Each structure stands twice: as C-alpha cells, then as structure tokens.
C-alpha cells in the first residue's frame, strides 16, 4: 500500500538483532479481484482501516511507529467489494449484514488500541 513504509519495515526487520516478523496484507484469488491490481487493493485496505500500517522496533528510541492515516474509505464498502465477503451475503444476507457491522466495530476498536499502545510506547 505504501512502498516507503514497506521498505522501512523490511530494513528495520533485517537490521534488528533478533527475530523479526512483518505482517502484510496479501490479496489472493479468493478476494475476487484482478490479481494485477493487488497493490490497489492493498491501498484500499489501508484507506478503509481494514489493515492499518504500523511498525514496532524495540531497538528504536520510540519503538512503535504509527504509519496509518485516519480511514478515508468506507470499511463496509471495502469488505463488500471482495468475493469472500460477497459469498456470505449471497448465502445469508441478514447474518452477513450483522457480521459486517461487527467487523467494522472491531476494526475501529483495533485501530483505537493500536493508537493507544503507540502513545504508551512513546
């Protein structure tokens, strides 16, 4: 979604003297998108708050770095555009809507927790 953030994450992981892990959003065929558009889908995931960008490096003076901006795309519009979520809507629309609402609330809570942790680690 952000090449600069990705490069920083890899550089920090490589330079850290210890185990490192990088979490990445990687669209697949089950998402129902044109696989030549994965970078666009990654950007949409970030812009909807589905996959916030952050880094944690215990070697840094400020270990937690929040790289995400406030979501500017609708979370539900994003998930409803992916095949794996569309299939749920086809099989059980009322349950799907309830789960979409819950997923959106969970994502907002997760974003708040990440921000709070980031503030604590400054």
Describe each region flagged by the PLM:
Residues 1-3:
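Acidic carboxylate-rich catalytic motifs and surrounding loops in phosphoryl-/glycosyl-chemistry enzymes
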Residues 6-95, 102, 112-116:
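Glycine/aspartate-rich loop-and-adjacent alpha/beta segment that forms the canonical ThDP
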Residues 107-110:
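Hydrophobic, well-ordered beta-alpha structural blocks that scaffold small-molecule cofactor pockets
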Residues 117, 121:
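Segments forming glycine/polar-rich beta-alpha architectures that bind adenosine-containing cofactors
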